Swiss-Prot record:
Name used for this protein in its record: Aspartate/glutamate leucyltransferase
Keywords carried by this UniProt record: Acyltransferase, Cytoplasm, Transferase
Membrane-spanning ranges: none
Protein family per UniProt: Belongs to the R-transferase family. Bpt subfamily.
């Protein structure tokens, strides 16, 4: 049985309608693969290629009937062309170092994660994560996840990019970094590193998750060109 057949046989469940977190006035529905289903690195890789996304042990995709604004976006790393702002970012971080680490608990990482969420989501439930929730969100036991650790010239932690290794690329799960250093553009730096790392590993893509045209929170993803979006069951190139 091929992997596409296995995907079609996977039990998938839909949530009820809920407020869309990205588009004001819109409702959303999400399809989740049964978290108790038997998964493997190969099957997960194929789901990523079919426009799915991982959060902890949950694999999901948008399932809205009336709206198809959410599209998976990936960067073909061998065709990627850096722009002036990307080169400025690399210059600003010329002294930074990156080390791939196993996805295990480190107190320094967890504290940075808390600082990042408190800056991005002040006053919300997300801003005070428990240690167990932190690790459950970033990793799972049926795929290989690395924590790419970014440090500055003085060995001070700058950020962490939780990244899944899939068959044809790297999937950016979540990146958190120091919120007090906007001049370094650390989120952009992490993606540029993932692009170069995928090239070094002989992989083809960096998967950045979902993108919505016109959504300010996701605008940065489309800044990496060319990129591809998953639309109508196939990947389409956006130059």
């Amino acid at each position: 049985m091929g992997r596409n057949d296995l995907i079609r046989r996977l039990p998938v469940y839909a949530t009820g309608e809920h407020d869309c977190p990205y588009l004001d006035g819109e409702t959303a529905c999400t399809w989740f693969v049964d978290p108790d289903a038997s998964l493997s690195p190969g099957l997960y890789s194929n789901l990523i290629r079919q426009g799915y996304r991982r959060s902890g042990r949950y694999i999901y995709r948008p399932g809205c009937d009336a709206c198809h604004a959410c599209q998976s976006l990936r960067i073909p790393v061998h065709r990627f062309r850096s722009r002036r702002r990307h080169r400025r970012c690399l210059k600003a971080n010329a002294g930074a170092t990156v080390e791939p680490l196993p996805s295990t608990y480190r107190e320094e990482h967890y504290q940075l994660y808390c600082d990042y969420l408190q800056a991005r989501h002040p006053g919300s439930e997300m801003s005070d994560p428990a240690i167990g929730d932190y690790l459950e969100f970033l990793r799972t036991d049926w795929c290989e996840t690395l924590f790419y650790e970014f440090r500055d010239e003085n060995d001070t932690l700058l950020g962490v990019a939780a990244t899944d290794l899939v068959a044809d690329g790297l999937s950016a799960v979540y990146t958190f970094y120091r919120p007090d250093l906007p001049e370094r553009s650390l989120g952009t730096l992490a993606i540029l590193w993932q692009i170069n790392e995928a090239r070094r590993l002989g992989l083809d893509y960096v998967y950045l998750g979902y993108w919505i045209k016109g959504c300010d929170q996701m605008r940065y993803k489309a800044d990496f060109r060319p990129h591809e979006v998953f639309n109508g069951g196939r990947w389409l190139t956006v130059a």
